[in-house]
Amino acid sequence: MGNIGFLLPLKVFVVVLCNFVTTLSEESPSTTTDQLALLALKAHVTHDPQNLLATNWTSATSVCNWIGVTCGSHHQRVTALNLSHMGLIGTIPPPLGNLSFLSELDIRFNHFHGLLSMELANLSSLKYINFGHNNFRGEIPSWFDSFTQLHSLLLYSNNFSGVIPSSLGSLSNLEKLILYDNDLKGQIPIAIGNLSKLKRLYLDNNQLSGQIPSAVFKCKALEFLSLTNNVLEGSVPQEIGNLTRLRYLYLDNNNLTGQLPSALFKCQELEELDLSQNALEGSVPQEIGNLTKVIWLHLYRNNLTGEIPATIGSLSVLRYLYSENNSLTGQLPLTLFKCQELEDLWLFDNALEGSVPQEIGNLTKLRWLGLNRNNLTGKIPATIGSLPVLDFLYLDCNSLTGRLPTLQPSLRGFSVSNNNLIGEIPSSVCNMSSLRYSLDLSRNNFHGIIPECLGNLSNSIAMVDLSMNSFHGKIPENFHKDCLLRLFGINDNKIEGSLPRSLVNCSKLEILDIGNNNLIDTFPIWLEKLDLQVLILRRNRFYDRIDNFEGKFSFTHLRIIDLSHNDFNGYLPTKFFENLQAIRSESENKDDPKYMKYSGTNRGYYIYESLFITIKGSEMELLKILNAWTIIDLSNNRFKGQIPEVVGELHSLIVLNLSHNSLSGPIPSILGNLSALESLDLSSNKLKGKIPAQLVNLKFLEVLNLSWNNLMGLIPRGKQFDTFTNDSYIGNLGLCGLPLSKECSNEQNLEPKPTKSGEDGDAVNWKYSILMGYGCGLVCGLSMGYIVFTTGKPWWLVRIIERVQQKYVIRGKIRRSGGRK
């Protein structure tokens, strides 16, 4: 025994040595393969902002110690590669396909680009792929079916195009398929229905078309399904009832039609349901009460009709209900106010009627309440003033009566415009220090004085609209030194006194409308440095000259100015027109104009929905004012002298009204350069000379009024001038030629020489042109007849408004609170 005792340590040494040699012989070549594959990837990275790969991925250290690399504990082969959120720019090289033990590949939130190399198909051990938020392009490779062990495929937010390959349907272990935010087209492949383990399917924000295949609803394990923002059509299949585990369903912003399928309400695990922005019709079924776990219910912008079912009261955990922009009728069901978890309730733009129940006071967690643009009647319940966390209350455009209740100080936005409310502004308004967005009491029957405290609130609130009531007294004098007002409207009241000079503190003020009151003051030159875009002083008692401009940058942002029906006098100030840079320059956003709005919240809303303008003697209201509108109305004052030549440099001007003044001299021929002009009214002045032939070049001109001046000579013909009637020229005894019955003498018959741009029509006989003009006028008249009859607006105004608003079609989607789970 003593002779062989020394053999035990020797045996241990031999075993360890053999294992080391075996490991070394097995590991080195394979480890080298992995290292070369990763070094090839490093070489294809053109930008490494944090130098993570540059300083860490070196041959001096084991690949298993490299950042983002995980190796197996036994064989020391690379099993996972995570380079997410590194800001890398580059491409994926073919050698990466040599990582034969790789099971997880995560390179999300980088800037990798190009096509996916086919050699990646060799990564047959992959279970998890995340290429999200990169710039890969091309079709999703059909060879993805090589990854038979794959349970998660995330290719979201890239530039993949083409169709979704049917081969993905063979990935029997797939649980997550996330392809949103790409450029995928075509139909959803039926083979998706083979994915029996699929739990999450996100195909939103692509261009997928056709109907939703019933096969999708064979994936009975689905918990998340999002097909948002595609061009899917047809009805929602009844097979959706198979998805009894479904928790989140987003089908919004498609072209889906038909009724809400009754089978949908078998999905009793639903927590979020979004069917908004489709063309769904019919009523909301009583079975909606089965969705007792739903938190987020979006049905807005469809064609839903009928009453809100009483069973909605069963949705005890409902927090967000958006069903606006439908045609829902009937009264607000009392059971709705059992949903005491409600935070957002939006039912505006429907046809709801009846009163707002006192039970609304039960919704103590309510933050947003939008019942505007319905047919609600009765008084505003006092309980609405006791909602402790209410931020936004919109009840405008109904038929509500009575007085305003005491309001919560927590309110940040409040509108009751377009109702039949009476009384004075309650003192509780002075305590609303949280107001940030809007205080809109316009178009009611309120009276009394405007509280001084509104001036103090101006350091927080963006919009105050008290227009079209019966307020009297003076405008508050105490606008805060840090005034944040963007809109201040008190037009159409009985306000007296002068404009408070503290308004100059409102450096962000864009819209000031004080028209149709009894204000007495001079022109507010002291507002010249503000960002005013709309200035309306019409129908007051403003007086004196407006030519005392000294600054170079006075009113440079003004696009709409209405000084009509005042007592201004003196000469039209050249300097004033020179400063109107917003009208002098061509519109930079002709193809993408915006409505004038203040988007201070995630819901967005218009801050100024109307103004009154005078065209051809008729006072009309324009709704939802476009940024493209440019209007100058100085009519019904006592201006004298000639029209400044600089007016012809206002290239974006659409409406110009200088009528009913004492202007003299000729009509400047440079007005023919106003290429956007659609309405020109110079009537009831003392203008003389001939009508410039250059005005024929105004191809959009719909309204021309030169009546009651001292003009003479032949009336120009051609283009829009062939459509104007006698009314445009009446009261000018020296004018002759069509459309007037007075013929011209030989001397008068010398037609003004046309400009170069008008010569293209000279080959046509002028009498024939006149006949064509009248013919076109007849056709247009017939086509517009229905609009005129139903709206009560003259055809010429309808055409001006429609042209401006149809030029600019705005289509956008407001994304609601909540997010992808």
Predicted regions mapped to residue ranges:
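Plant-biased, solvent-exposed loop and capping regions
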Residues: 1-821
